[in-house]
Amino acid sequence: MSMRSELPKQDEIIFKLNEIVEHELAGVVRYTHYSFMIFGYNRIPVVSWFRSAATETLGHATQAGEMITMLGGHPSLGIGKLLETHKHDMAEILNESMEFEIQGVELYRELLTLAEESGSITLEEYSRRLIAEEELCVCTKEKAL
C-alpha cells in the first residue's frame, strides 16, 4: 500500500503527527533556551549537549513533517506549549527536559497505536524507533539526576 493511499484512521494519524511536529518544535526552542541559561564550570559541555538536543529535536520535527506530507497532509506551522519557569538550576532544567521527553514518548505511543490500527508498517516502525530514542533521552536525564 502506498503511503499516499487512504489509510484507516489517516486523518487521526495526520493530526497526531502535527501534534508531534508542534511538540518537537517547542523542544527546539526549549533546548536552545536552556543552552543560554547555563553558567559555571560545566558550561561548555552542557551548552553543547543542549544544543545537540535542539538539533536532534529539530530532526524529529522534520521527520514527522515528512510523514505528514507522505500521507498527503499539511504540516502545522504551530508550536507546542512553551513553559518558562524561570528556574535555571541544572536539576530543574534536567527535570523539565525529562518531562518534555516523557510527553514525547506518550505522543509517539499514541501514534504507534494509530499506526497499528491502520496497518502501516512504515508508521509502526517510525513510531517504535522514535519511542526508543525518546526513552533513551529520558534514561540519560534520569542518570544525570
Spans of features found by a protein language model:
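Iron-associated oxidoreductase/ferritin-like identity signal
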Residues: 1-145
